[in-house]
């Protein structure tokens, strides 16, 4: 069973951004968008060799999160993104005049009555 370990609100005004980071000691991480934004959340695989280009162009119609070391998602209002906490992610600079607002959270596995993880 997973439980929320922490939860917080992000209010990114014009010019605000977040650099690449991970969420250690978590089972899952997520973000729920309360507003739309043209500026994406960006993901980067933690293993450098995955981030270097090694796919054969002849086999790739278009790059996506399954065949790339980096990708992005443009936030849409009322959208929930859940991702592994070890996945590097950052938020692009908000260049809009309105605030970008989201709720982020992490989960952990709940210990059983003997203090052990299931």
Question: Which sequence ranges carry the predicted segments?
Answer:
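A short coil-to-beta-strand element that immediately follows conserved catalytic motifs
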Residues: 1-7
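Residues that flank catalytic or metal-binding motifs in active/ligand-binding sites
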Residues: 5, 26-28, 37, 99, ...
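Short beta-strand element of the conserved SAM-dependent methyltransferase core
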Residues: 9, 91, 105-107
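Catalytic core of non-heme Fe(II) oxygenases with the double-stranded beta-helix
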Residues: 10-82, 113-118
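Short beta-strand His + acidic residue motifs that chelate non-heme Fe in jelly-roll/DSBH
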Residues: 18-21, 89-96
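A short hydrophobic beta-strand segment most commonly corresponding to one strand
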Residues: 30-31, 97-113
């Amino acid at each position: 069973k997973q439980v929320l370990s922490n939860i917080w609100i992000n209010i990114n005004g014009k010019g605000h951004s977040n650099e690449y980071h991970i969420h250690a000691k978590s089972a899952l991480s997520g973000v729920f968008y309360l507003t739309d934004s043209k500026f994406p959340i960006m993901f980067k695989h933690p293993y450098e060799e995955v981030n270097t280009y090694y796919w054969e162009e002849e086999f790739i119609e278009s790059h996506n999160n399954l065949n790339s070391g980096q990708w992005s998602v443009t936030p849409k209002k009322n959208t929930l993104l859940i991702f592994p906490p070890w996945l590097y992610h950052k938020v692009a600079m908000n260049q809009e005049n309105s605030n970008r607002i989201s709720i982020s959270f992490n989960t952990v596995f709940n210990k059983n009555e003997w203090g052990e993880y299931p």
